[in-house]
Structures are given as structure tokens and as C-alpha cells.
Curated annotation (Swiss-Prot):
Belongs to the RNA polymerase beta' chain family. RpoC2 subfamily. One of its GO terms (cellular component) is chloroplast. It is found in: Plastid, Chloroplast. One of its GO terms (molecular function) is DNA-directed RNA polymerase activity. Its cofactor is Zn(2+). It catalyses: RNA(n) + a ribonucleoside 5'-triphosphate = RNA(n+1) + diphosphate. The gene is rpoC2. Its EC number is 2.7.7.6. This is DNA-directed RNA polymerase subunit beta''. It comes from Panax ginseng.
Length: 1387
């Protein structure tokens, strides 16, 4: 007894808490040492001890035991403060909705986590024997987060869709919840209840499908004799030791393992914990183990490939139903896998980021060239470093160096003073490439109504060229200019023209007149005229005077710009052409589209005699090829294409070639240009009919004589239509050759006399020296009309010479005489082009002007179109042409009753110069203003057509005046940028005399605020030019039937004294965010757009900013009217697809059913290509293809196992790899026969076992074409050897009918078939009856011989590349670095 006591005294007393995992470890070690029976006795004693102690403790719980954490109050206050700041930033437009959501979730998550960590120390300090503390941290049941909900705060909850609700529950269950919090927490609770029910049924069904796939797999042999293995390597610390041990224990080695010359383990030895520890200490070379994947047969498994049975820790017995065990061990934990979707670590990020903190106080320095500014995912400014960055922190006595890895955010500026432990950088977490992320869309809706505006370039998404989806290239604001739209159909009628002022009592205000929006224009028009003008209504409108018209209506005609007429900007080397095609509606007749194109060089500079516009007359258009001729003998010299001289990209005329031509001729012929190698099916000089085959692919379109000419590398084949005359007939025609003969020339002949009705072309053809014949070819005659008709084409007003600019209309023929014209396919060829040529006269006073700057402004406003071609002679007054079209014309008679039949493509365009403008001002009440200062220093010009425009002259303040002058001297150029606006053109007028900032459109005239009162009386169709930060001018949409009520435009006024600092910051059209200081007397109060700048004040139109980051999609057009609740922007942001989003069961099921994942890592495709190249390069092409399918299968198997294990491990469930491997082996064991190359044994598209295909190939000694397929578990269950098993799973009738038709035989090898038919199941003891033992023993030695032979061959052929495979696989195919220990070996 004493001896025993003494022994006990020497024993180590293990004074530590033993939790669940420690208990598991203890039990497994006990089993190893003492065996099962002894261990169960020891465990009994432990159990008794536990119950005894628990009874003695007699623990109880009261509400007083729930101690709240004292620091909670200020933590929550701090978080609320941060949220408030965030809300304010969002309101100012500094962060957008997604950033705000992310940040608020992270703020609250951090708070909640911090509280949770405080909880345990708090208990330990205040009351270590608190029952809650003792029970919750014992490791028996319950976890910290549940206690946290009792005594900390409940924190963030998920809504029924699994999205986070960004309003956290601040109370805990001890304090009690408020009503809102209660409702939010009910979401979570309800989700929990539903999930549990759904989860149980899901897990049950998953188990059923799994067992179905593998029910027939039984251990049938001791050794299948395979030579394959999978390599597991503990090297380079890539995988945790725990996983390594778990992978190896219970497996069987596939190859001997050497340490230097010494063999430390032999083939077919099973691995226990001792051996594993030796492997770890020795860091041995890759260890090749046998797995179910490497077993020879798919319908059973051998003992050695399966390894130890998990129940008794020995090799599996023969006849053990390992398939069913595998299915159940994967299915059963399914009930434990949580389906909860709320997160354990930032929802929106791939794990929360790691921080780099400053080691001490000091000044921070880094190389600014290596970083570029960016935004973090929370919208904070930061620097992104693309390579390793060394940061030095200089404190008083010591210099610290900090290395920041690439792709990290630097959160401080250079030379900034940082304090110790301050966060200076954020390392991007989860940079593993195959961490799938899913893209989530978040829509931002407008919360006010008004006009949309954005202030950087916005590109059209190429997929939606004609739609309204735009992409943002850089971070910018979207603004909604507030205003109350008043929508009316009557605006579509022509009574309201743009720029009209209306009395508030006029008809569009009366609600009963605003007809339903669904009524089409015609109906509305009809209704309108019939009701209002028929005299039945008392308040009908008798004349236009009440409408207060400002514009004028003397348009020569009313045109409609067709809704779909797109602006084609054809890129020609260095200019762009804008054809203005309009379909003109004139008393219900549709006129053909005019096809006038204005041509502007990209740099916007015209020389003298440049062509500014041209018109392609459809009468002079041909589809076929041919030759042009001018007249008969005297050929006029005319402007040819070659004589247009290109000077800096501008076409210009040389006058010496301009001669009069009144008619020209076109001789059609069919031309085929063929490559020199092509075979021609017709002979030279033969005569063919229509639609004769010429070459293999082409047929003739006309009949006639064939001429074949061989050039250097091609053959030209021409077909001339016409009559053939042989010279036997004496006629004078045959003497001519290559002559045009006018109509009426007779051809006399003994038998007949014939007069030609049209012009003909006579050509003499000599096939041989003596013989010749004459071909008479038809000719198409074109008369070129002289100037009288041209006046109708271009507006006559244009052609009068004014002051010093002349425009002339010139016709020119594009092809010289006798030039062959080639038409390709169906393109039509324009023969004559009508051009508008610009010229100007030199002013004697001014120095000679060589260039004119031009720009093209296209403005669309409520169905009104203006085209301004602005031509600016540098030192003369500015000239404008305006083109006005009123699509809404409903047949109103123009005021001067002028004849409207004069359809005119350049309609009502005006060229103004000084004198002319003055006149037109008097006539038309101010269509265009030029504003000249007396001293002629600054000229400002506003393109407006109403007296509603206002002008800001040079300020009286001298300083400000200088600024303007300087800017004019600096850059008087007008740049023309070929970038897209709403119509396809947008233009920068910003530098135009710097007054271009003042271009507004149809502005309300507010010289002082009292005038606002008058505005209450009148409505007005309000549109502006919207100008963005780059000075581009955008024009609103033309289809908009919306009148903005100016009284509701939310103006506010701001007094400020102009001083040097402020005046320079204000420019018209500028947007101002909230709290931006623009005046001395404090910050600006509301965000908005500067509408009017006056000497002592500015008028600002209220606006609301929304921030948008690159990649966001903007909906709607520039200047469009938006209503509350319309979608403004869609953000696309990435959430990580880690274990949080599709978690647990759904994820496992997704993998096992081989469902596709929505988003695939971007670089995956490239990797696969690289991998394929790698294989063929190293092994040569035939081998590359041979092992392609094999490697695909092996690789996909490994990757599937890793994926499934990852899900289970993340939930803390331990499943041995071999169970998963058995199932994965079944779903990857079939291949799809891809060609009918298998000598009629298998059909293409048939699923056959991989091993069967290989054996068949060896037997037939020919290559077999098959491709690897992944079947889901359901599909694999329906593709087994046994139709009885299939039928008892799903689709019974279909399976049985098919089996009967095919005459399938069921060999009853599986368990299920035998259960269904009531036979003995072939497992356990019943297994002995199935395989005669004698045969089994004979087989093995024989196979071993083969094995060695085969092993040698395989080694020679493939696997001196073993290293290569390992490296390839680890590089290319692993989800996480953790798994790249598994390579592939086939030695």
C-alpha cells in the first residue's frame, strides 16, 4: 500500500482544464496504449467522478448572476459617434451607400467583438465563481457568443434573405430589448427555426443520395496490386501539421520511404501515429500513400487502398460495407452544419484586414513615386502601393524601418507625425486567388425629384449604345438639381414652343386638360383641337397672344428628326463627319432623308476654300461598277478626287480645275476581282447568260461578254452587257472604237434599220489579229443641274455674300474620265457630290487670316433641335449658323404664310455678322446676342434665342478683370473633342474668351430678387446647358415633355462681398458641396449649382450630390427629369464567397451535385491554358493528350475532396478524407465516349467506367477517344451497373422500361439489389459465399509479377517528370495554400 502511495506522489498532477478536444485526444491515446476494454473502464471512472462533482457543486442560475460589462456604455457611445460622422459624410456626398453600409457594419461588428473579448476577463476579475462563468466556459455546452448575447450586446442580425441589417441590437437580453430590436431579433429567431427544420430534411436527403451512390462498395480483396499513389508532403510548411497527421494516420504506404540510404517504412505498411511523428521529425521526402482513388476497380475496394477501419483502428476486414459507412459519415454531420448566413468576420470583405501599426512616435517618410492615391473600401483616402514599400519612422533617437507588402493601403501621408501604435497601413486580407467572390449589385434610389447631372466624363456601356446605361471611368458625383417637374402631354403640341413663357392660368396648368400619358400624340392632338377650337368650351384659346410668344414661326418648313436617327460619327483619319439625317414630315408626306453631312476636322481649323458640308444626291448613286466618261470627244477638266489637296487634314479646292460640266455618262459593267490562284469556269471573250457560275463560289449577275485580265497577283474578270456586231455588216459604227454615240444615229443595213433611243458606247474587241467585233454597250446619262436648282438644296440665305464670309455651292464629280469605278458587294457609289465651300475676304485693316476655328454644337431641347456650326475668324466678329427644326409641327401655318413646299436640307440657317445681328435682334426679339464692350477688349457671346438670357460683363473689380484678360491671352483656342455627349458630340467651349462659362440656356433673369415675385405668374419650359467640371457643355434630352415650374425650383440666395479669393472660385454652372467655404462669412450651407453670379451675390439652385465610384452604372440620360424613387446608380461590389455566404450543407451539396458556381476566378482560364501548354511542352504532344484525361480526373478528385473538407473543417467537424474519397471516386469514375472510334463497342455519348475504357483500349489495341466528366451524386446513382438499384432510387418506370428495352442484366452485386429481391446481401458473413477463396489466393502472386513489369514501363515513360508534376499541380490547382500538399504520382 505504501509503495502505491509513494508511486502516486511521484506522478505528475495535470492541473489543467480538459475540454472536449483534449478529452478526445486522451481517449485516442488510451485506446492505442491499453485497447478498447481497458479504456472503457477508465472512462467509466471519469464519468462517475464528473457526476459526483456536479452533484456536490449543486450550481444554480439567477438573473443577478448575469453581470453586464462596465465598459459597454462608452463603447456603444463611441460606435454611435462614428456612425453619426459616417452619416454626415454620406450626406455631404463623400462616401456612397455601399461604403457607408460596409463601414457601419464593421464599426458595430468591432464593437460587439470587443465586448465579447472583455467578457471573460471581466468575469474572472469580478466573480470567478459566477455560475454563468463556470458553466459557459467549461467547454461542455454553449459558447461565448451565447453568453455575450446575455450580458454583452446582441449585435448585428441578418434579415430573412441572409443580408446584414445595419442597425445593430445594442441591448442584451439581461437589459431587455426595445420594440424595434425585438422585431429585428425575431428575424433571426424565425430564420433559426425554419433553418433547423429545412436542414434536417436536407441532411436526410443528402445522406440518402450519398448512400445510393456507394452502397455497392465493399472490401472484397486484400490487395488489388495497384502501383499508383498520391503524394503527401510535409515540406515547406504549406500545410498545418494537424491536417498532415489527419491525412496520414490510418493509410497504407504505396512506396518504400527512404531516409538517405536507410528504409524507414516499407510498401503496404499501414501508418500509425508513431510513424507519422517520425515523418514529421525527419521531414522525409514526399510520402506516397494508397487511397480509394488508386484502387484498381470501381465496383469494390481492397483492404490496403482503404486503410484502417475507423471503428477498431485495424485494417478493414474483408466484407466490410465501407461504402455505406462513407455515405453516412458525410451525411450525418450535415445536421450539425449551420446554415446561418450571418457572418463571423466582416461580411463584405474577404476576412477583416490586418493592420500595420507604428512602432513608435515620429515622422513617417516613404517614396511617393511608388504609391498612387486611391480610396479604401470604406471611402477613406489612402495610397495604394503596388510593390514592397519601405517606410521609415524617425523618432528622436532611433529610426524604425517598416516593410509594407504590395497591394496594401497606406493610410498616412508623407512627413506626417504618427503616434505609437497608430494604424499606418492596412494589408489586404485573403489574397488567395481562388477565393471565389460573388458580385452583388446594390441600387441607389433618388430621394428627391429634379434634373440629373454628372460632372465627369461618362461612357456609354458598349452593350447599350442606344440605351441609357452609362459607366463611370473615375470617382465622381452625380447631382440631382432640384425642381418640381410638371408633366403635361400638351407640351408635345406645337402651341408651346421652347422658350415660351406661359401664364400660370394658361391651359397646361388646369389639371383636367392634362390628358393621360398613355394617350398617343395623335389622339391628344385630335382631342385638343376638337375640344378647344370647336367653340364648345368657354375658355378656349382664340389667339396666340395670350401665350406670350417670344420666338417666331416663320420657318420655311416643319421637320421631324426621327427618333432613331443616330448620329454617325465616321472616323476618317483626322476629321469627323456628322451626317444630319432627318425625315421631314410635310402635310403627312414623308420626304426622303436629306443626307447632308457636315465635315469638321478634329482640330477644328478650316483653311480658306475648305469644304464645310456636302450633300450626296441619291440620284447620282450607283450600285454596280463601271466607267465614267464626260461628253464625247472634248473632255472637260474637272475637280477630281486627287486634286483636292489635304492641308492639315482639311479638304480644299484648287480653283483652276473648276470648269463647267453639264452632263456625264456612266457605263456599267460587272467586275469580279479574284485571287490569282482561283480557277475560272468561263473563257476569255466567251458570252454568258445571267447567273452563270464563274468560279466555285461566284455567279454572274448580268449576262454578256467576258473579258479576263491577269494582273500580278489577281485576276480581273469583267462582264460587259450589250449587243455584239460582227464587221461583216457594213455599218459605220464598226469603224469607231471607244466612242459615245448620241441617240438618234441610225444604223443602216440591208435587212433592218434601227435608231438608238439612248446614248450608246461602242467598243472594239479583237480576240485574234484578224478577227474583230464591236460591242455596243448601254450608257447611263447623268445631267448635272446648274446653280438654279442648287438654291433649293442649300438655303439661299447662305449663298449671299455677307461682310467677309462667302459660302458657295460646288458640284464635283468624284471620279475622273475613263477611271474605272469598282463597287464592292452592295455598297453604293456616289458619283457626284454637292459641296458647300467656305471662303472669306481679307479685311484691309486686320492682318491676313489664314485659318478659321470652328466647332459644331448640336443642341436638343424638348423636341427642338439646333445645330450651330460656329466659325470663328480669329480677329473678326464671330459667325453662327443656327439650324432650327420643330418636330412638333402639327400643321400650324407659319406667321408670314410663306410657301412651305421649299424643302431645304440646310433649312433656315443664318450666318450672322455684326450688322446682321443687330437687324435680327430687332426683328426677332433677340434670337442671338453678341455683346461687345466699348473698348472691344472682351467679346462675350451667348447663343440664346430668347430675351431671357442674361449677361455678366467684365467685373468692375480690376483684379478680376485682369484674370479674364490673362486667360484670354493664354488660350484663345477652342478645342473640339471627339467625345460622346448625349448625341454623340459634346464640345468644350470652356476657353472661349472665358465667358463661355456664362453660356446658360433659357435662364430666368434675376437681376435682383424682387423679380422672383413676377415669376410666380408664369410657367416656363426650363432647360439649361449643363456644364461639367471639364467645361463641356451637355444638352438635355429632346423628348422630354416636362415643364419645370420655376417657382418650385428651390432657389436660395447668398450674399457675399466679392474679394479676390472668393470671386475667382465661383464660376457659373459650378457645383458646390455642402460646407464648402466660398465667402468670408462662413461655410456655404446647402449643396447646389451656381446659377447666377452677380457683383454682390450668387443665385444657387439646390442640388443633392450622390457619390459614385468607377465601375458603377449610371441609369438615365444627362439632363433627364428624375422622380422620387427612380434608380440612379447601380454599384457592383464583391463579397467574398468564403464559408459565410453559401455555408454548410448547401455548399457541400453544391460540390457533390457538381453545380456550376456563378463567378469563376478571373485568372482560372489562363491557368488552365498555361497548364496545358506546360504538359505538352514537357511530354510531347501524344503523351500530353494521353494523360490529359487522366490528369483531369485526378486533379478534379483532389480538388473536390479539399473543397468538401474545407466546409466541414470550418464548422469544426472532423471527417476522415477516405470517406469523401470513396464518394468522389464514384462521381468521377465515368467517362463520356466522344467519338465513334472505339470500333463499334461503345456509342458516342455513352457513359462508361474509366477502367473499362482503358481495358477495352488495351484489348483492341487502338486509341479510344473519351473525355472526363463529373457526374453529380444524383446522376451517378442513375448510371450504375444495376438497374434495380437505379429504379428503387428515382424515376422507377423510366429506368425499368429502358432496362427492359435494352435487355440489361443485373448481376446483383450491390446491397440494395439484394435487399429489394430478398436475397442474401454480399457483405459481412454473406460475403464469403460470393468469392471462392481459392481463386482469390491464386490471383495475387500473378498480379504482382505483372505489377513489377508494368511499374518499370510506366516509370520509364512518364515519371522522370515527377518533380514537374508536383510543381505544376501545386502552382495551378489549389484552392488554398493549405491544400497544396497533394500532388499526383503514378509510379
Amino acid at each position: 500500500m505504501e509503495v502505491l502511495m509513494a508511486e502516486r506522489a511521484n506522478l505528475v498532477f495535470h492541473n489543467k482544464v480538459i475540454d472536449g478536444t483534449a478529452m478526445k485526444r486522451l481517449i485516442s491515446r488510451l485506446i492505442e496504449h491499453f485497447g478498447m476494454a481497458y479504456t472503457s473502464h477508465i472512462l467509466d471512472q471519469v464519468k462517475t467522478l464528473g457526476f459526483q462533482q456536479a452533484t456536490a457543486t449543486s450550481i444554480s442560475l439567477g438573473i443577478d448572476d448575469l453581470l453586464t460589462i462596465p465598459s459597454k456604455r462608452w463603447l456603444v457611445q463611441d460606435a454611435e459617434q462614428q456612425s453619426l460622422i459616417l452619416e454626415k459624410q454620406h450626406h455631404y456626398g463623400n462616401v456612397h451607400a455601399v461604403e457607408k453600409l460596409r463601414q457601419s457594419i464593421e464599426i458595430w461588428y468591432a464593437t460587439s467583438e470587443f465586448l465579447r473579448q472583455e467578457m471573460k476577463p471581466n468575469f474572472r476579475m469580478t466573480d470567478p465563481f459566477n455560475p454563468v462563468h463556470i458553466m459557459s466556459f467549461s467547454g461542455a455546452r454553449g459558447n461565448a457568443s451565447q453568453v455575450h448575447q446575455l450580458v454583452g450586446m446582441r449585435g448585428l442580425m441578418a434579415d430573412p434573405q441572409g443580408q446584414m441589417i445595419d442597425l445593430p441590437i445594442q441591448s442584451n437580453l439581461r437589459e431587455g430589448l426595445s420594440l424595434t430590436e425585438y422585431i429585428i431579433s425575431c428575424y433571426g429567431a424565425r430564420k433559426g427555426v425554419v433553418d433547423t427544420a429545412v436542414r434536417t430534411s436536407d441532411a436526410g436527403y443528402l445522406t440518402r443520395r450519398l448512400v445510393e451512390v456507394v452502397q455497392h462498395i465493399v472490401v472484397r480483396r486484400k490487395d488489388c496490386g495497384t502501383v499508383r499513389g498520391i503524394s503527401v508532403s510535409p515540406r515547406n510548411g504549406m500545410m498545418p501539421e494537424r491536417v498532415f497527421i489527419q491525412t496520414l494516420i490510418g493509410r497504407v504506404l504505396a512506396d518504400d520511404i527512404y531516409l538517405g540510404p536507410r528504409c524507414i517504412a516499407t510498401r503496404n505498411q499501414d501508418i500509425g501515429s508513431g510513424l507519422v511523428n517520425r515523418f514529421i521529425t525527419f521531414r522525409a521526402q514526399p510520402i506516397y500513400i494508397r487511397t480509394p482513388f488508386t484502387c484498381r476497380s470501381t465496383s469494390w475496394i481492397c483492404r490496403l487502398c482503404y486503410g484502417r477501419s475507423p471503428t477498431h483502428g485495424d485494417l478493414a476486414e474483408l466484407g466490410e460495407a465501407v461504402g455505406i459507412i462513407a455515405g453516412q459519415s458525410i451525411g450525418e454531420p450535415g445536421t450539425q452544419l449551420t446554415l446561418r448566413t450571418f457572418h463571423t468576420g466582416g461580411v463584405f470583405t474577404g476576412g477583416t484586414a490586418e493592420h500595420v501599426r507604428a512602432p513608435s512616435n515620429g515622422k513617417i517618410k516613404f517614396n511617393e513615386d511608388l504609391v498612387h492615391p486611391t480610396r479604401t473600401r470604406h471611402g477613406h483616402p489612402a495610397f495604394l502601393c503596388s510593390i514592397d514599400l519601405y517606410v521609415t519612422i524617425e523618432s528622436e533617437d532611433i529610426i524604425h524601418n517598416v516593410n509594407i507588402p504590395p497591394k496594401s493601403f497606406l493610410l498616412v501621408q508623407n512627413d506626417q507625425y504618427v503616434e505609437s501604435e497608430q494604424v499606418i497601413a492596412e494589408i489586404r486580407a485573403g489574397t488567395s486567388t481562388l477565393n471565389f467572390k460573388e458580385k452583388v449589385r446594390k441600387h441607389i434610389y433618388s430621394d428627391s425629384e429634379g434634373e440629373m447631372h454628372w460632372n465627369t466624363d461618362v461612357y456609354h456601356a458598349p452593350a447599350f449604345t442606344y440605351g441609357n446605361v452609362h459607366l463611370l471611368p473615375k470617382t465622381s458625383h452625380l447631382w440631382i438639381l432640384l425642381g418640381e417637374p410638371c408633366r403635361s402631354d400638351l407640351v408635345a403640341l406645337s402651341i408651346h414652343k421652347d422658350q415660351d413663357q406661359m401664364n400660370a392660368h394658361s391651359l397646361s396648368v388646369k389639371r383636367r386638360y392634362i390628358s393621360n400619358l398613355s394617350v398617343t400624340n395623335d389622339q391628344a392632338r385630335h382631342k385638343f383641337f376638337s375640344s378647344d377650337f370647336s367653340g364648345k368650351k368657354e375658355d378656349r384659346i382664340t389667339d396666340y397672344s395670350e401665350l406670350n410668344r417670344i420666338g417666331h414661326c416663320n420657318l420655311p418648313y416643319l421637320a421631324i428628326l426621327h427618333a432613331n436617327s443616330d448620329l454617325l460619327a465616321k472616323r476618317r483619319r483626322n476629321r469627323f463627319i456628322i451626317p444630319l439625317q432627318s425625315i421631314q414630315e410635310h402635310e403627312n408626306e414623308l420626304m426622303p432623308s436629306s443626307g447632308i453631312s457636315i465635315e469638321i476636322p478634329i482640330h477644328g481649323i478650316f483653311r480658306k476654300k475648305s469644304i464645310i458640308a456636302y450633300f450626296d444626291d441619291p440620284r447620282y448613286r450607283r450600285k454596280s461598277s463601271g466607267i465614267t466618261k464626260y461628253g464625247t470627244i472634248e473632255v472637260h477638266s474637272i475637280v477630281k478626287k486627287e486634286d483636292l489637296i489635304e492641308y492639315r487634314g482639311v479638304k480644299e479646292f484648287r480653283p483652276k480645275y473648276q470648269m463647267k460640266v453639264d452632263r456625264f455618262f456612266f457605263i456599267p459593267e460587272e467586275v469580279h476581282i479574284l485571287p490569282g490562284s482561283s480557277s475560272i469556269m468561263v473563257r476569255n471573250n466567251s458570252i454568258i447568260g445571267v447567273d452563270t457560275q464563274i468560279t466555285l463560289t461566284t455567279r454572274s449577275r448580268v449576262g454578256g461578254l467576258v473579258r479576263v485580265e491577269r494582273k500580278k497577283k489577281r485576276i480581273e474578270l469583267k462582264i460587259f452587257s450589250g449587243d455584239i456586231h460582227f464587221p461583216g455588216e457594213t455599218d459605220k459604227i464598226s469603224r469607231h472604237s471607244g466612242v459615245l454615240i448620241p441617240p438618234g444615229t441610225g444604223k443602216t443595213n440591208s435587212k433592218e434599220s434601227k435608231k438608238w433611243k439612248n446614248w450608246i458606247y461602242v467598243q472594239r474587241i479583237t480576240p485574234t489579229k484578224k478577227k474583230y467585233f464591236v460591242l455596243v454597250r448601254p450608257v447611263v446619262t447623268y445631267e448635272i443641274t446648274d446653280g438654279i436648282n442648287l438654291a433649293t438644296l442649300f438655303f439661299p440665305d447662305l449663298l449671299q455674300e455677307r461682310d467677309n464670309v462667302q459660302l458657295r455651292v460646288v458640284n464635283y464629280i468624284l471620279y475622273g474620265t475613263g477611271k474605272p469605278i469598282r463597287g464592292f458587294y452592295d455598297t453604293s457609289i456616289q458619283l457626284v457630290r454637292t459641296c458647300l465651300v467656305l471662303n472669306w475676304v481679307q479685311d484691309k485693316k486686320s492682318s491676313s487670316i489664314e485659318e478659321a476655328r470652328t466647332s459644331f454644337v448640336e443642341i436638343r431641347i424638348n423636341s427642338l433641335i439646333r445645330d450651330f456650326l460656329k466659325i470663328d475668324l480669329a480677329k473678326s466678329p464671330i459667325l453662327y449658323t443656327g439650324k432650327r427644326k420643330d418636330p412638333s409641327g402639327s400643321g400650324l401655318i407659319s406667321e408670314n404664310g410663306s410657301d412651305r413646299t421649299n424643302i431645304n436640307p440646310f433649312s433656315s440657317s443664318f450666318f450672322y455678322s455684326k450688322a446682321r445681328i443687330k437687324e435680327s435682334l430687332n426683328q426677332n426679339q433677340g434670337t442671338i446676342h453678341t455683346l461687345l464692350n466699348r473698348n472691344k477688349e472682351c467679346q462675350s457671346l451667348i447663343i440664346l434665342s430668347s430675351s431671357n438670357c442674361f449677361r455678366m460683363g467684365p467685373f468692375n473689380d480690376v483684379k478680376y478683370h485682369n484674370v479674364i484678360k490673362e486667360s484670354i491671352q493664354k488660350d484663345p483656342l477652342i478645342q473640339i473633342r471627339n467625345s460622346l455627349g448625349p448625341l454623340g458630340t459634346a464640345l468644350q467651349i470652356a476657353n472661349f474668351y472665358s465667358f463661355s462659362h456664362l453660356i446658360t440656356y433659357n435662364q430666368i433673369l434675376v437681376t435682383n430678387y424682387l423679380q422672383l415675385d413676377n415669376l410666380k405668374q408664369s410657367f416656363q419650359v426650363l432647360k439649361y446647358y449643363l456644364m461639367d467640371e471639364n467645361g463641356k457643355i451637355y444638352n438635355p434630352d429632346r423628348c422630354c415633355n416636362i415643364i419645370l415650374n420655376p417657382f418650385n425650383l428651390n432657389w436660395f440666395f447668398l450674399h457675399h462681398n466679392y474679394c479676390e479669393e472668393t470671386s475667382t472660385t465661383m464660376s457659373l454652372g459650378q457645383f458646390i458641396c455642402e460646407n464648402v467655404c466660398i465667402a468670408k462669412n462662413g461655410p456655404h450651407l446647402k449643396p447646389g449649382q451656381v446659377l447666377i453670379v452677380q457683383v454682390d451675390s450668387v443665385v444657387i439652385r439646390s442640388a443633392k450630390p450622390y457619390l459614385a465610384t468607377p465601375g458603377a452604372t449610371v441609369h438615365g440620360h444627362y439632363g433627364e427629369i428624375l422622380y422620387e424613387g427612380d434608380t440612379l446608380v447601380t454599384f457592383i461590389y464583391e463579397k467574398s464567397r468564403s464559408g459565410d455566404i453559401t455555408q454548410g450543407l448547401p455548399k457541400v451539396e453544391q460540390v457533390l451535385e457538381v453545380r456550376s458556381i456563378d463567378s469563376i476566378s478571373m485568372n482560372l482560364e489562363k491557368r488552365v491554358e498555361g497548364w496545358n501548354e506546360c504538359i505538352t511542352r514537357n511530354l510531347g504532344i501524344p503523351w500530353g493528350f494521353l494523360i490529359g484525361a487522366e490528369l483531369t480526373i485526378v486533379q478534379s478528385r483532389i480538388s473536390l475532396v479539399n473543397k468538401i473538407q474545407k466546409v466541414y473543417r470550418s464548422q469544426g467537424v472532423q471527417i476522415h478524407n477516405r470517406h469523401i474519397e470513396i464518394i468522389v471516386r464514384q462521381i468521377t469514375s465515368k467517362v463520356l465516349v466522344s467519338e465513334d472510334g472505339m470500333s463499334n463497342v461503345f456509342l458516342p455519348g455513352e457513359f462508361i467506367g474509366l477502367l473499362r475504357a482503358e481495358r477495352m483500349g488495351r484489348a483492341l489495341e487502338e486509341a479510344i477517344c473519351y473525355q472526363a466528366v463529373l457526374l453529380g451524386i444524383t446522376k451517378a446513382s442513375l448510371n450504375t451497373q444495376s438497374f434495380i438499384s437505379e429504379a428503387s432510387f428515382q424515376e422507377t418506370a423510366r429506368v425499368l422500361a429502358k432496362a427492359a428495352l435494352r435487355g440489361r442484366i443485373d448481376w446483383l452485386k450491390g446491397l440494395k439489389e439484394n435487399v429489394v429481391l430478398g436475397g442474401m446481401i454480399p457483405v459481412g458473413t454473406g460475403f464469403k459465399g460470393l468469392v471462392p477463396p481459392s481463386r482469390q489466393h491464386k490471383n495475387i502472386p500473378l498480379e504482382t509479377k505483372n505489377k513489377n513489369l508494368f511499374e518499370g514501363e510506366m516509370r520509364d515513360i512518364l515519371f522522370h517528370h515527377r518533380k514537374f508534376f508536383d510543381s505544376c499541380l501545386s502552382k495551378n490547382f489549389h484552392d488554398t495554400p493549405e491544400q497544396s500538399f497533394i500532388g499526383f504520382n503514378d509510379s
